[in-house]
Amino acid sequence: MSDTTQLRASRRAFLGLAGGAAALMATSGTPAQAARVKTSARIVILGAGAAGAALANRLTERLDGADITLIDGRPEHWYQPGFTLIAAGLKPAGYSVSGTTDWLPKGATLVAEYAAEIDPEANRIVTASGQSVPYDYLVVATGLD
């Protein structure tokens, strides 16, 4: 191969390619959207904080027919980046607190209890009250606490 036909990896080549791709995307008119997938999967997300709620939103956008359940006993959702604004006196104390259900997508179910047991052999979660929640897929998004 001659030097003129080889692709050269350089910052200039990358920026040129990225600029061309950005221009092409800007002129496309409609945003790219992933195709929806039909499924009857039972998906349980353990934790309804920022990660669990975000995942539930993405899954309901992309999956048709999935049974999406979140399990979290905490009734309030804490917007943690707002804590610094409260501490600085820029926002009132209640600024960063809202209801957990305010952040969940339509079509997702919230079991407002804490999980007591994960039973991977039976593919189920047992809540603090003894309710059994079966799953095909489990996501543990309980955060740091």
Regions found by a protein language model. Name each.
Residues 125-127:
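SH3/SH3-like beta-barrel fold
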